[in-house]
């Protein structure tokens, strides 16, 4: 995906293992919009510890020149991921990033009905509720239906969504 030099975009960066939270804190200090999906788990002493869901991956929303300045001059310890096909910085489309964030932020457990059964891998759109507008594929796990959203073809997030909220595309 190609963007203009001064257009905001989501860039994909890699931080060293275990430094994701530090990179997040530095980006917050600089006032840069970013996203690192995390979860809270119990550490070995029973304390709650925040850990990244996707090891080493950081998403930074910035212009291309500002993104490069962050790494070279602002002290953000990360390297950008390059798209192998275009040999340019990897960029995530805004819609895909928004869908991915919304699905990670919310999971619903209610049930509902559709006019016909869903099949595995079928493309659906959520038509109501907090995930309205999100598009993804249907996955069934232990008898429950989930909407699965893919980011860059290799990162996946899922949320249980009532069947009545889904529209088959």
Positions of PLM-derived features:
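Acidic-enriched and Gly/Ser
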Residues: 1-123, 139, 148-169
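Short coil-to-beta-strand transition motifs
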Residues: 120, 127-134
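Short beta-strand-centered aromatic/proline hotspots
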Residues: 133-141
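Glycine-centered loop/turn positions within well-structured domains
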Residues: 145
């Amino acid at each position: 995906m190609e963007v203009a030099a001064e257009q905001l975009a989501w860039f994909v960066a890699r931080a060293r293992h275990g430094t994701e939270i530090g990179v997040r804190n530095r980006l917050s200090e600089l006032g840069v919009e970013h996203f690192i999906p995390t979860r809270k788990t119990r550490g070995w002493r029973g304390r709650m510890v925040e850990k990244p869901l996707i090891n080493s991956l950081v998403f930074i929303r910035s212009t291309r020149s500002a993104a490069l300045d962050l790494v070279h001059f602002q002290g953000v310890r990360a390297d950008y991921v390059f798209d192998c096909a275009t040999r340019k910085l990897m960029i995530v489309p805004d819609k895909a990033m928004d869908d991915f964030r919304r699905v990670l932020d919310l999971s619903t457990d209610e049930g509902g009905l559709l006019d016909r059964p869903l099949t595995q891998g079928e493309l659906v759109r959520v038509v109501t509720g907090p995930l309205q507008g999100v598009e993804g594929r249907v996955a069934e796990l232990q008898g429950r239906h989930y909407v699965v959203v893919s980011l860059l073809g290799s990162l996946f997030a899922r949320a249980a969504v009532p069947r009545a909220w889904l529209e088959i595309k």
